[in-house]
Amino acid sequence: VFCYDNAGVPTLETLVWTNDTTRATALAYQNGVLIKSGDATRRYLGSFYASGANTTEDSAANRYLYNYYHRIRKGFSVIDATNSWTFTGATPVRQANASAANQCNIMNGVAESWVEATVATVSENSGGSVTIGVGVGINSTTVNSAQIFGNITDSTTRGAHTAHYRGIPAAGRIQIVWLEETANSGTDTYYGDNGTTRMQCGLVGSCYV
């Protein structure tokens, strides 16, 4: 979104990106101010991601509005209310519960603000002395980008573990994914809420919008 002087009237102008992560026209600096590259009359104000036809969204799951000026920090979160689920197979890392819903999405207009995300889960494995864990994926359902993360190496005993990501992602729509990892031995059981009100696993974080 850009603003320009239209015969004395401040006027907004939008420019659709090429894709989720690539601008159709780059930004540039003019006297320390971000502008549309090649047109110093257009001052950059922010970006938004279209969640549907002629609509966008600002919710706990999707922070799709980004202001370059006067940004505030807002939280995002996703939980899985499934009591529990199992994970076996040759794919060592996947999105939690194999569900595309287990992620949060943000719009990052300029790569200069910190994003933080934490996954907290409880799990167990039916085998003996195998390692299972969790992570945070940034635009990936198979690569863990968390800088701090834990695992458990035990059998038939539930363990709690977390993963934490803190970084400045690239500009564009950013998918922040709740990941889980299997040891490919035995059967992993991950828990959502275990059918109680005393447990809830999920992903939480915050970003500037």
Per-range role (PLM):
Residues 25-27, 94-97, 154-156, 177:
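A short linear-motif detector with a strong N-terminal bias
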Residues 118-171, 178-209:
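Terminal beta-strand-rich extracellular "head" domains
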Residues 79-88, 94-99, 136-140, 147:
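Substrate-binding/charge-relay-adjacent region of secreted/lumenal peptidase catalytic domains
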